[in-house]
């Protein structure tokens, strides 16, 4: 990973921890606000909203695929741990609070940034990657049921961005079956 301001010698010295303030709002905040606007008949309408959501789902799938490609699993993938960072020229914050930018525009132009890697791990196990996707799928379904059907776009984009996705997605089917069995049996 290239880090602005660090030369090659500094990066290879080891022991570095880099933190950054991520401008923007969580995907959860943007999706909840957008769904509320559609329900109230505000904004550009349901069809445009769903198109924007599909675009966001594609960005999420690509980001997760890139993370898995480098051997990292998140451990707690939810829409609360996905930030939408606006382009630099669009950044306007309100005292560290939510960005004062239209949610629809955020969906179209925002960059996905994964946050909160407290439960993350480095792994080469397809099972771990599949569990990551399963957690995101379950979290998405419970938090955003009104647009749950758009989640397939995450899987499509994941499949395009991660070369090992076919095996992971097959493993995801097994993980889902175990999850259903577990919830059925208590």
What are these regions (language model features)?
Residues 26, 91, 122-124:
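Conserved protein kinase catalytic core
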Residues 81-114:
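Conserved protein kinase catalytic/activation segment
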Residues 63-67:
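Conserved hydrophobic alpha-helix
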Residues 102-186:
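C-lobe/activation-segment region of protein kinase-like
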Residues 1-56:
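Conserved structural core of kinase catalytic domains
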Residues 69-79, 84:
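Catalytic-loop of the protein kinase fold
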Residues 23, 79, 119:
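Short, glycine/acidic-enriched loop or turn micro-motifs at the edges of active sites
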